[in-house]
């Protein structure tokens, strides 16, 4: 009898230990354990993944901006801090999302149009920004001053759900309107959306532009620091055009109310090393309400 009780007790202890181990493993895989920075949940947009991991360790969660924004919009409380671009916290504020985000700007880089230098030289309006390039999409190069062998004008942009994708949409809206005061009821807003609809959304737009230059895209929307870091030996074949009005990607640390604090200074170091500069006062984006409409959240 005692032997039977002992066996049952031993089995119970083994099962209990396995359940505890499974629980710990689950916490580890879901990211609910502490990170290398000592915080329970830091979420980072895909574009800033390398800088985030350098700053806060490999346990940060990396996902596209829209995924995190939707979680926060639904009242997600499992996030202490969201490392993203300015514009995203503003659109959540416009949606009256609670808890509120405490935002600290860290570093900025211009949003630019990177174009095939040889071909851009034949497009008279190339320096005018989005309104020029988007309106030219699909036109034969021979009809806009280029060579017939180049085919048609093509433009690539990051996918809308990405952190940069929202900035591209916002900058296009301001370009067509002429200022950041654009509203969703303005015809220029609609025109910018129609024009962007002709561009190719590509999650690897910068890599494909550079690796297949000059064939894949005539021009793309990108972050200046990223182009500088990846262009390599093809730098002399690429021309960068600042946007009109100017637009910037500003990396921010957005702390969720009640969440653990995150040292923004740690993020500034890898971004500065990657060519980012001190944060600008204005990102050149429309207001949060317009960005909310563009996001589709």
Segment roles from a protein language model:
Residues 26-151:
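N-terminal segment of the mature folded domain
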Residues 128-142, 155-161, 251-284:
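Bilobed periplasmic-binding protein/Venus flytrap-like ligand-binding cleft at the lobe interface
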Residues 112-196:
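Helix-loop-helix "hinge/cap" segment bordering the ligand-binding cleft or interdomain interface
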Residues 47-49, 66-69, 87-91, 119-121, ...:
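Solvent-exposed loop/turn segments at secondary-structure junctions
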Residues 104-113, 233-265:
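Periplasmic-binding protein-like
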Residues 171-243:
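Ligand-binding pocket segment of bilobal, Venus flytrap-like solute-binding proteins
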Residues 1-36, 256-297:
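Extracellular/periplasmic juxtamembrane helices and adjacent flexible linkers that interface
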């Amino acid at each position: 009898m005692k032997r039977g009780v002992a066996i049952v007790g031993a089995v119970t202890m083994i099962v209990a230990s396995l359940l505890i181990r499974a629980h710990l493993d689950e916490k580890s895989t879901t990211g609910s354990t502490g990170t290398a920075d000592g915080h329970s949940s830091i979420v980072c947009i895909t574009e800033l993944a390398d800088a985030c991991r350098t700053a806060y360790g490999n346990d940060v969660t990396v996902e596209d901006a829209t995924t995190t924004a939707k979680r926060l919009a639904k009242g997600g409380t499992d996030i202490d801090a969201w490392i993203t671009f300015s514009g995203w916290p503003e659109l959540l504020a416009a949606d009256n999302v609670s808890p509120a985000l405490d935002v600290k700007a860290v570093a900025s880089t211009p949003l630019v149009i990177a174009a095939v230098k040889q071909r851009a030289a034949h497009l008279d309006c190339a320096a005018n920004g989005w309104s020029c390039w988007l309106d030219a999409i699909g036109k034969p190069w021979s009809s806009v001053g280029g060579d017939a062998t180049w085919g048609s004008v093509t433009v690539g942009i990051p996918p809308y759900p990405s952190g940069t994708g929202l900035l591209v949409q916002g900058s296009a809206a301001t370009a067509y309107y002429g200022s950041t005061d654009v509203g969703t009821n303005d015809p220029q807003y609609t025109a910018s959306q129609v024009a962007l609809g002709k561009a190719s959304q590509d999650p690897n737009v910068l890599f494909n532009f550079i690796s297949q230059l000059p064939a894949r895209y005539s021009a793309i929307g990108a972050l200046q620091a990223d182009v500088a870091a990846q262009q390599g030996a093809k730098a002399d074949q690429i021309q960068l055009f600042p946007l009109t009005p100017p637009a910037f990607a500003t990396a921010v640390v957005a702390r969720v109310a009640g969440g653990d604090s995150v040292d923004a200074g740690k993020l500034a170091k890898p971004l500065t090393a990657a060519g980012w500069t001190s944060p600008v006062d204005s990102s050149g984006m429309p207001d949060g309400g317009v960005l909310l409409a563009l996001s589709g959240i």
